[in-house]
Each structure stands twice: as structure tokens, then as C-alpha cells.
Amino acid sequence: MYIPLKVTTDYSLLKSLIKIPNLINFLTCNNISACGICDDNLYGVFDFYFNCKSNNIKPIIGLNAQIFAKDIYLYAMNYQGFLNLLKINTLIEKNILDIEKLKEYKDNILMILPFSSLDLLNDVSFEPKLYLGYHTEEEKIKCLEITDNSVYVENIKVLNPEDLKYLKYLDLIRKEEPLNYTSNYYYDYKFIDKEKIKEVVSFLNVEIPLD
């Protein structure tokens, strides 16, 4: 199994069925050595971080932000990057995040721009650590035509494939059109470049001080 970079947890209200304790158990049982959560807030970070540390799993801390209603995934490269994520999260809560404010806190942040948000590529080109994210083979081909910095990212919202059918009810509660959830998130597709995932993971090293 590959290292997941974009797990959405139930801290993202009505967007996921994944609870932190269940996620940690899944990672442990499947010998997955690192994992990234990337919610639309940072409320679950400490729960996730310390549970990972207690189980010898490398915690990767991300934040799913939006610019012009397009998703961008922001990851802390170190503790300073984590502090910048906290500042960005505050801007999100105040509904005042824009490109210029994002530039102010770009240091020590790695950004993954999902394929669905490629329209933002020119706007976010200021980011020194920028990757494009794909989740199909066709998207991978198109991303690689732009840059070698392209990495597999699947927005994981369930741990068991049989639970996929329940996600549509969360969509309905949020009064959104239900999506067709058919992916087997943890199947190792041949087109996944695991080495590129490891490269990204190697940049993300947050240590949160206890004092």
C-alpha cells in the first residue's frame, strides 16, 4: 500500500466517515509508516499527531484550503510551516484567504495542486515547493506534461470500500449533489509513482514541541 497524503477525517464536518482512532488502527494493521491528514480545518491535528507518534507512524499535517472555490492542499514542512498553517487556517475561518495573503505564509509550506484546480497554476507559481496532484492515469499523463513534480493524491474519506455507499448520505445532508464514489482507495494501481510520494513525504517533518 502507498502512503496516503490526503486523508479527510470526520473533523471535516459531514465530509468523511474516518475517525482518528480508526485511522491509526488501520495504518498500524497495514504497516503504513506515514500518513497525511488534510482537512478543511486543523482541529484534528493534535489528536492525529500524538496518536501517530505513540504508534511509530510519521504524521503529515495538511490543510485543505480553497482559492476561487478551487481546492489546494497545503502541508507543513516543519514546525514553522505548521505555525504558518495555523495562520492560514485563521484566514479561512474569517473567510478572507486570498492569493496575496497565501503568499505571506508560503515559507516552509509544500503545496499540492490537485488536477481539478489546474486553473490556479499561474496564481500559485510563487510557491517554491509545488506539486501537481493526480488520481487517474490520464491525469498523471497530463500533469507530467507540465512538470515532473506530479504526485498521486486520492481524497480518502473511508477506510473500508464497503462504506463508500454511505458517503452519498453525507453529500445529501450537506445539500450537495451526491458523487459517485467507486474508488478502491488503497488498491495499488500500477500508475502510482510510490517513489514520488516518498519524495514528498521526505520534505514533511513536523515536530511539535511539548513545552
Functional labels for PLM-detected ranges:
Residues 1-11, 19-35, 57-62, 66-133, ...:
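Conserved active-site carboxylates
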Residues 18-20, 41-51, 137-144:
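Active-site-adjacent beta->alpha loops and helix N-cap segments on the catalytic face
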Residues 50-53, 90:
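Generic short alpha-helical segment signal, independent of protein family or function
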Residues 55-57, 146-148:
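Helix C-cap/helix->beta junction micro-motif
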Residues 63, 151-154:
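Non-cysteine beta-strand/loop elements that form the S-adenosyl-L-methionine
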